[in-house]
């Protein structure tokens, strides 16, 4: 990560004709927010931070103690290239703290940073990569999103079946301009479904990249008159969209996922921890009622199991070599807060290492096939958001690793989501208004 001083940032503003500066952060569900200041006010904002009303952000603060402060993470500074070149727009990702400088429990970037610090304390380095899927839909003549996909292509199709290739190219070129390093892009299985993968990076950088990636996709799609949706299951008869999280561990420069993984090795214990806590993590990796329509079909897992190569498993070990050796967690979806999702996966793996958990045997069966899981004694991922919340609320592990104010507010908001959907006169219309148009 580059080191920047406040003066470096001010020089950058001057050299690049920046007139507008966004201070970006996210709520506890991963919805990006921002406050903008004029470049002329940037020196004061860098020195003092930017104050805002935390009671207006989902899951943050109560009205009677609402003041919070944004502190920009200077190395995350970037130009938004889709904005005007005259009077350019610049953006930081920010940490959130209390006015007296005390840590704020809802600062999800801080939570992930702390989990990464704990790994480094053990001499371990963690790299993370994300594979993000999304849908592209047509807008109606008033510019409102429809559920009509822009094409009827399938996996790896090309034009004319793939109508999104030019948009993906524009997205990848924009990512490259902004330092996100796209690795692969292609049409996915669903009609109008696409996938773009980023090269791996450190945990915090990857979570920032996921947030920026979604911002880029939406901006480029909107510029083209198209609606980009990260809803996990926007079409009931098409594949769901995942956010597969790939992790590798290094000790003294050696990738611990390379070669055979002994059940009681560091890598084996890490995987065992992730599997052991996967049901508790699901409310964070899959935060919407819609998320649970994805499980159990179209390469999305249902059971707590692992294997090599097998895409019907929750965790798989791809057959690759060298630095590409890793574990892949296949349950998360793109509606999640990437800081919490990645941070909690690290926490689960760390718990496995610290308690020397032993990796169970692999399950070398196609668990998408009816009856294949019978007699194996496998646990299942939660079937609904209500079940996921109930499991998480009873988790000693989550109460130990998460700030109390964050977990309490998160669970309360999730229960409210369940109740609102249950009370809706037209659940499908409620989902369209509150999730399809926004996620």
What are the residue ranges of the model-derived segments?
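Glycine-rich, acidic/polar active-site loops that bind/position phosphate-bearing ligands
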Residues: 1-439
């Amino acid at each position: 990560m580059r080191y920047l001083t406040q003066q470096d940032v001010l020089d950058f503003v001057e050299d690049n004709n920046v007139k507008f500066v966004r201070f970006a952060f996210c709520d506890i569900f991963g919805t990006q927010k921002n406050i903008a200041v004029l470049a002329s006010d940037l020196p004061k904002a860098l020195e003092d931070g930017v104050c805002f009303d935390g009671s207006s952000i989902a899951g943050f603060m109560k009205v009677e103690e609402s003041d919070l402060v944004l502190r920009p993470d200077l190395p995350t500074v970037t130009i938004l290239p889709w904005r005007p070149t005259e009077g350019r727009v610049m953006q930081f990702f920010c940490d959130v703290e209390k006015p007296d400088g005390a840590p704020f429990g809802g600062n999800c970037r801080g939570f992930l940073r702390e989990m990464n610090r704990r790994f480094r304390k053990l001499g371990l380095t963690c790299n993370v990569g994300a594979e993000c899927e999304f849908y592209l839909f047509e807008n109606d003549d008033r510019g409102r999103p429809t559920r009509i996909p822009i094409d009827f292509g399938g996996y790896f199709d090309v034009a004319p079946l793939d109508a999104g290739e030019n948009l993906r190219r524009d997205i990848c070129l924009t990512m490259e301009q902004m330092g996100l390093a796209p690795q692969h892009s292609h049409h996915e299985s669903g009609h109008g479904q696409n996938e773009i993968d980023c090269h791996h990076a450190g945990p915090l950088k990857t979570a920032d990249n996921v947030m920026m990636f979604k911002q880029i996709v939406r901006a480029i799609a909107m510029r083209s008159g198209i609606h980009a949706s990260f809803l996990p299951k926007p079409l009931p008869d098409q594949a769901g969209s995942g956010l597969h999280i790939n992790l590798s561990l290094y000790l003294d420069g050696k990738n611990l996922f390379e070669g055979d993984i002994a059940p009681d090795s560091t890598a084996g214990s890490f995987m065992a921890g992730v599997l052991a806590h996967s049901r508790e993590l699901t409310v964070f990796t899959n935060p919407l009622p819609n998320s649970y329509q994805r499980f159990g079909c179209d390469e999305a897992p249902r059971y707590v199991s692992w294997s090599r190569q097998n895409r019907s498993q929750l965790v798989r070990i791809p057959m690759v070599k060298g630095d590409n050796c890793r574990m892949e967690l296949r349950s998360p979806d793109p509606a999640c807060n990437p800081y919490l999702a990645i941070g909690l996966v690290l926490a689960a793996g760390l718990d496995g290492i610290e308690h020397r958990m032993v990796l169970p045997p692999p399950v070398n069966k196609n668990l998408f096939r009816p009856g294949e899981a019978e007699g194996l004694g496998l646990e299942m991922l939660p079937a609904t958001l209500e079940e996921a919340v109930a499991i998480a609320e009873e988790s000693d592990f989550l109460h130990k690793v998460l700030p109390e104010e964050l977990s309490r507010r998160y669970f309360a908001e999730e229960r409210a989501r369940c109740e609102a959907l249950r009370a809706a006169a037209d659940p499908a219309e409620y989902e369209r208004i509150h999730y399809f148009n926004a996620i």
